[in-house]
Amino acid sequence: MSVIVDYRNVEIERAEKTVLKNVSFTLSEGEFCYLVGRVGSGKSSLMKTMYADVAIPSGEKADVLGFDLLNLKKRRIPYLRRKIGIVFQDFQLLQDRSVNENLRFVLRATGWSQRQDIEDRIEEVLTAVGMANKSYKMPHELSGGEQQRVVIARALLNKPALILADEPTGHLDPETGYQIVTLLHTLAHDGHSILMATHNLQLVDDFPARVLRCADKNLSD
């Protein structure tokens, strides 16, 4: 399997303070990996560097999907982000638009123009997450777990090689959280690389996979 993320001796800062130092790890195509650590340990900051939301002040190498983050021009950032699917714990769906309209909005914003292609892609991603029969529902009509499935569908729209899931079960009950993690593992089996940040070690025990740990400003594998 090819390596799609390669960090070597990277330093990560927030508000001009080092949160992680000497970060070195790789992530391969189709790999599922947990990112664990206490609140404030640097999990989210590390993820944000991967889609250029947080700049990397120094490092030997920081490559994501063929993009050199240490020398990435601002105009290239949208091209990087189109190759990455991002899943947050707080859903961030447009509340005044249906599921279909939420997904259609993203596709049009990222350059899709043919109506049939758009509708076909929406059907594909909703089927993949088990939400094909809820496409005309409004977000407030969905449970938390259903909303998170829509968020994952949204992350899949542009066929990303990498999905970053930042505490995707944080606002869900345990049973629903298990369903979401099962879905993410299925997506990894289908070829997507998944990096999932969580502080829920029970999930890590119940769904074993590789674990990266953030602690004391260090990342250990």
Residue spans of the language-model regions?
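ABC ATPase NBD coupling module
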Residues: 69-85, 187-189
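Conserved ABC ATPase signature
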Residues: 138-142, 146-148
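Conserved signature/switch motifs of ABC ATPase nucleotide-binding domains
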Residues: 137-140, 158, 190
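Conserved ABC transporter NBD signature motif
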Residues: 59-68
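Short coil-to-helix segment of the ABC ATPase nucleotide-binding domain corresponding to the Q-loop/switch region
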Residues: 97-105
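Catalytic Walker B motif of ABC-type/P-loop ATPase nucleotide-binding domains
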Residues: 163-166
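Helix-to-loop junction immediately C-terminal to a conserved catalytic motif
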Residues: 51-52
